[in-house]
Amino acid sequence: MIQYPRYRQHRFSSFQVIIAGFAAVDLVGALLLMLPIAAQQRCITPFHEALFTSTSALCVTGLVVQDTGSYWSAFGQGVILLLIQIGGLGVITVGAAFALLSGRKISLKQRSTMQEATAAPQMGGIVRLTGFILRITALFELAGAALLLPTFCADYGLRGIWYALFHSISAFCNAGFDLLGTEGAKFVSLTRYAGDPLLTTVIAALIVFGGLGFLTWEDICTYRLDFHRYRMQSKVILVTTAFLLVLPTLYFYCFEFTAGSARQRILLSMFQSVTPRTAGFNTADLAAMGSTSQALMVVLMLLGGSPGSTAGGMKTTTFAVLLANMWATFRRREDAEFFGRRIDGSAVKNAATIAGMYLTLFFLGAFVIAAAEQLPMSVCLYETASAVATVGLTLGITPQLGILSQGVLIALMFLGRVGGLTLIYAAFGSSPAHSRLPQEKIAIG
């Protein structure tokens, strides 16, 4: 009797499923955008441009090689908006929502994947959390669209309804895509509305709300203003977010936007402190800003939003944990602390790993683009920070980049959206090693 070898069935980890899901949706989006019906001129869009746009939308970045408003048709804009919504919620969350709506039960493996995708602290209650994410997203996006409706309808008539919905979803998902460009004025973002307090405030609020994270909103909805009952993570996110909003606003007001009325300066300063984390809209000419302001925006872009949110970047908690660990080292304390709680040592190591990974990708991508395009390093650093942190702000060079440089930005956007730890665990596994080697000291600093 012939015995055939038995092959061990390979089981994909939750992290590999997340990456595969993003890649599959990205490819489908690119193929749809290549169709002639997706372009206003009814032409076939080159694959690399379609893939760039699909990746930028799915990874809620906002970098574009074609002006969204003047190049893409209603079908193409619809595909882009769908990709933005899927990317903002997360591919796994959207898949789980469809499974729940169809009446199917969520398996233990699927719950584990959903936990990793939403940055939930435990697997229990993950289905309930998914429902909360869908409800809070619909609430903010519809409310934002209703508030934007008067402005856009006054300028664009009935087309303003589509504009209001598109920009509301794009803002809450921290995508930064806009439809305001024309054949005569492309890539203008929100500059024509720089002095409109309603539109800029609504867009800025949606960006901040989307970047706080769904677990933070669960605490806010559950405990209202009782800050002491929030999770430590939510407290850290809210305090760090406030810090990263107020200080840059003051800087821009005092040193960058020094002309115009006080109201105009406040609106410009506030919006430019919000949008680098990590939306991609702009109400000012970014290329005309001072080098110090541009450097500050690069830092804000890399820091990004909060975990479990629609935003990208290293995340506010990563920044806060590194600061807390540095403060503990200054005080010669063994553990970093927040709000009377000790931070787990693995969180500190993860924060350092994520920061190191983002900075490596940031600098490496800039070197490749600078060498390939013969551009100043400072400009390339701005673009790669925008890509890896999934922001979408640009100094205007992205549409002129060659295929190699666009490929670098595509890779950075994808890696930046799936997350540093997700990528590491998908490649090397997430099971901790049980054996330990002998220890030896090494000099640091």
Residue spans for each PLM region:
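Membrane-proximal intracellular helices of multi-pass ion channels
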Residues: 1-445
